[in-house]
Amino acid sequence: MTPDELRIAGFLDPRRALSFFEELPGGAEAWERDLSASADPDQALLAAIRLHEADPGLVRALVDKPDARRRVCAVLGGSQWLGDYVIADPTRAVAIWEDPGRSEQVLLASVGATRTEGGAYVAAEGARADDLRAAYRRVLLSVAADDLTSEDPGALMPEVGRRIADLVDATLEAGLALARRDIDPRGETPFAIIAMGKTGAR
C-alpha cells in the first residue's frame, strides 16, 4: 500500500502506519482493512504493535482468524483503556471473541458464590475482589466488541444497554456476596439498594 492509500483509509500518519504494518505478521494485507474500520485507525495500529510485542504468537494467530482479528482491531481502536488492559495481559484477549456467558453466572462463579437457605448469595472463602473485577472486564470486553463491530449500532443499542445493565446488576450481586461472606455469612440482614436507571437499568 502507499501512504496516500492509507490516508484515504483513515490513517492520520500514513508514513508511520506504513512502517508499522511491516512489523505485523501478514503486513498491511492482513490488517489494514480491519484497522481502518475502527474508530481510530492510528490508535488501533499502535496498540496492535504493542500487543504483538507483548505476545507475538497471539497476533500471529489472528492473521488466520478474520472474525477474531476484526473484533480485536475494533476494541483496540475504540478504547485506549481496554486496549491497554488487554496488552498488559494478552491472555485477556480471548474474551474479545469468545462468548463469556450470562453476566450473572460469570460474575457469581468468579467469587464462588452459593445460595444460603434464605436465597442470598455468599462468596467462597478464597474469593477476592480482584476475581470479580477480572470477570466484569471479561464480560465488558465481549459487549464492547459486539457493539464496535455491529453493522447497525443504532439497532443494537437497546441490547447493549440491557447487557450493560445486567452486567452492573450481576456485579452488585457478586460484590454483595463477598461482603456477606465477611459480615453476614448466613444472609440474614435485610436491606435494599436503590439506584437510578439512567443508562438502561431494568
Mark where each language-model region is:
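Non-catalytic regulatory/linker segments of enzymes
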Residues: M1-R202
